[in-house]
Amino acid sequence: MTLLEKAKCGEITAEMQYVAEKEGVRPEFICEGVANGDIVILYSSRENIHPVAVGKGLLTKVSASVGMYEEADTVDGEMAKIDAAVKAHADTIMDLSVRGPIEEMREKVLSTVDRPVGTLPMYETLSVAEAKYGTALDMTPDDMFDMIEKQASQGVAFIAVHPGTTLSVIHRAKDEGRIDPLVSYGGSHLIGWMLYNNTENPLYTEFDRLIEICKKYDVVLSFADGMRPGCIADSLDHAQVEELVILGGLVRRAREAGVQVMVKGPGHVPLDEIATTVQLEKKLCYGAPYFVFGCLPTDAAAGYDHITSAIGGAVAAYAGADFLCYVTPAEHIGMPNVDDVYQGVMASRIAAHAGDVAKGHPQAVKWDLDMSVARRAMNWKEQFKLSIDPETAERVWRERSTSFTSECTMCGKYCAMKIVEKYLRAE
């Protein structure tokens, strides 16, 4: 039985107990959430990987994506980025390698990290097909499904696929005249294959085959959105919404078969449409956990898109998004380096936490309250400990202050906390 099937029977598993303790909720709450699809548990057959729960009533999670894209990229170089993501406390890792020793990279990640790993099998399918046929346009549906099963069997916790990107959706996008037609790497290659071969999406027409694989290995499905908007001007157009409607139907089919599923989302969304986007997914996809890429509420911040993403991510988390895919400062302009990865995770974690505070999550609220108490007491060591990035907080303080008992250099002797403590403290 899969985890979802066990939850439907009311069986509380070791994975449910583990994530319940981490989240500060009852195991029964987790079991019920998994059973009705509001919560998914990302876990692996690999003993070194600890489960992570994503969904309604839980802390908002953050995922960091790495992978070999350029010829100069190496396994060791990407592992250094993963180390940075882990140090920054990303909840999950996605290996999105498209070239080089992809299988070696995936095995290294799966055997090294202690948190769930996700993949997008189409990436390796394209690489293998190009080597095998000379062009990825000649790949077959069997190539796609064989790669999905291969990666599922190796212990990945979740796989991203594009089953909702159908020919009708593609023609809808073409007719609408988008500003930026496609920005999904996997989605664009799948669409190119579909149009070249005049063939419907095999992930849609043979969806039962996909479900069988995921059920066999109890892998969480992550429905990727090939039609996610590439700029805020294209947000919530007909193609995006039509794909979401299709995904909603597939969510129900996956659940009925005993497979956990979450839905991925944009991307570029103006601030006033973020809540609507989240609410639409929750409605059309029957409350499935929502995994958003950002969101990015402006297209004009190249070099600072980790900040853009944090702004949109906080709004999305508050509106009900459950999972944030990080965005680095290098987004739209180049491949991220180790520091970019670290900064991207931190920015997304801040967004996730801000959203959790606004939602009134007890752990998040207590964290901020504890920091406020430490600040009033000018307890620097406790403030460092409670900071989302303790190392950076303490480093900056040490560079500019001299004593653990004094005010910081921001206000100096005019420190508001110190003045209040001296003259206005109530006995």
Curated annotation (Swiss-Prot):
User: Which free-text remark accompanies the cofactor?
Assistant: Binds 1 [4Fe-4S] cluster per subunit. The cluster is coordinated with 3 cysteines and an exchangeable S-adenosyl-L-methionine.
A Gene Ontology biological process term? thiamine biosynthetic process
Cofactor requirement: [4Fe-4S] cluster
EC number of the protein: 4.1.99.23
Q: Which GO terms describe its molecular function?
A: 4 iron, 4 sulfur cluster binding; lyase activity; metal ion binding
Taxonomic lineage of the native organism: Bacteria, Bacillati, Bacillota, Clostridia, Eubacteriales
Q: Tell me what gene encodes this.
A: bzaA
NCBIfam families the record matches: PRK13352.1 (NF009895), thiC (TIGR00190)
Q: Which domain of life is it from?
A: Bacteria
Coiled coil: which residue ranges? none
For whether the record's keyword set contains Iron-sulfur, the answer is yes
Q: Which organism is it from?
A: Eubacterium limosum
Cited Pfam families: ThiC_Rad_SAM
Functional description taken from the UniProt entry: Together with BzaB, catalyzes the conversion of aminoimidazole ribotide (AIR) to 5-hydroxybenzimidazole (5-HBI) in a radical S-adenosyl-L-methionine (SAM)-dependent reaction. Is thus involved in the anaerobic biosynthesis of dimethylbenzimidazole (DMB), the lower axial ligand of vitamin B12 (cobalamin). Requires BzaB for catalytic activity, as BzaA alone displays no activity.
- Similarity comment: Belongs to the ThiC family. 5-hydroxybenzimidazole synthase subfamily.
Q: In which pathway does it act?
A: Cofactor biosynthesis; adenosylcobalamin biosynthesis
Q: Which PANTHER family match?
A: PHOSPHOMETHYLPYRIMIDINE SYNTHASE, CHLOROPLASTIC, THIAMINE BIOSYNTHESIS PROTEIN THIC
- Keyword 4Fe-4S present in the record's keywords: the answer is yes
What are the UniProt keywords, alphabetically? 4Fe-4S, Cobalamin biosynthesis, Iron, Iron-sulfur, Lyase, Metal-binding, S-adenosyl-L-methionine, Zinc
Could you say which enzyme class this protein belongs to? lyase
Record's protein name: 5-hydroxybenzimidazole synthase BzaA
